[in-house]
């Protein structure tokens, strides 16, 4: 079971994001959000919809595990060819694609390698994830490198989802404590 409050080690004094509270703030401000996820396999979307009323702000998302699926949904294949599927450029293209398809205020794109290296993609590095939070037209892209040795795939997905929610809270509500 996914804990609604996922804590992270922080270098500042701000508390880790309470996901349910974040979603309630999005609902209260009528701020819509969509996702295109690869390495988190839909966990971010699932965690959004764990909050009652989320359907008011979450029209949907895509799980695009394969390059071909990303391209089918609308990611430009030239982005994958030029920068690789595991890149901030691909994460941004994923966010822009889902935002365009679902017409949301905020879109999240996330791609990376959570466990074993991907034999189909040369840019695969274990524990390296890229995500982009697109707020209206402003892209905020992140690279996270983590030693995932000894962690289960689910623990890794939870950790990266928490990073996304923490960044989302800071970007969407910068004045909150």
Predicted segments with their positions:
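Short alpha-helical segments enriched in small residues
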Residues: 2-177
């Amino acid at each position: 079971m996914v804990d609604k409050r996922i804590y992270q080690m922080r270098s500042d004094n701000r508390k880790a994001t309470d996901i349910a509270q974040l979603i309630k703030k999005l609902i209260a401000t009528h701020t819509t959000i969509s996702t295109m996820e690869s390495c988190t396999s839909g966990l971010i979307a699932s965690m959004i919809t764990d909050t009652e009323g989320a359907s008011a702000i979450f029209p949907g998302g895509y799980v695009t595990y394969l390059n071909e699926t990303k391209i089918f949904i609308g990611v430009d294949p030239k982005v994958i060819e030029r920068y690789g599927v595991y890149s901030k450029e691909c994460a941004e293209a994923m966010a822009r694609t889902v935002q365009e398809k679902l017409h949301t205020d905020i879109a999240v794109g996330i791609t990376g390698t959570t466990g074993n290296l991907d034999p189909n993609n040369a840019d695969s590095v274990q524990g390296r994830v890229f995500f982009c939070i697109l707020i209206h037209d402003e892209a905020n892209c992140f690279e996270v490198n983590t030693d995932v040795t000894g962690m289960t795939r689910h623990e890794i997905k939870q950790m990266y989802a928490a990073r996304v929610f923490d960044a989302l809270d800071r970007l969407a509500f910068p004045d909150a404590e």
